């Protein structure tokens, strides 16, 4: 069973994020959604709690999403904690 972490700012969650999760669900059995702490980042629109709640609402019925995390640490350490061997990344532009 392949588990992956998708760590992103989610400020706000966009259709691009949804597309990445949908595409990734074809490759991974389980996906952990992680919003990263970007406190103090210029232009921040939502608090960490609000961003995590948005992710939960957007991905609520997605069959591959197994957990939601808010992280202050590195994504690599989260992968170790949740026993994920893969990280999902998006590319802009």
What are these regions (language model features)?
Residues 1-93:
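Nucleotidyltransferase catalytic core that binds NTPs
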């Amino acid at each position: 069973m392949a588990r992956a972490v998708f760590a992103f700012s989610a400020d706000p969650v966009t259709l691009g994020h949804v597309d990445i999760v949908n595409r990734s669900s074809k490759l991974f059995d389980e996906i952990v959604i992680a919003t990263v702490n970007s406190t103090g980042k210029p232009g921040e629109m939502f608090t960490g709690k609000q961003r995590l709640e948005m992710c939960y609402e957007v991905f609520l019925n997605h069959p591959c999403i197994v957990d939601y995390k808010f992280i202050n640490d590195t994504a690599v350490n989260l992968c170790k904690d949740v026993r994920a061997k893969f990280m999902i990344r998006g590319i802009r532009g």
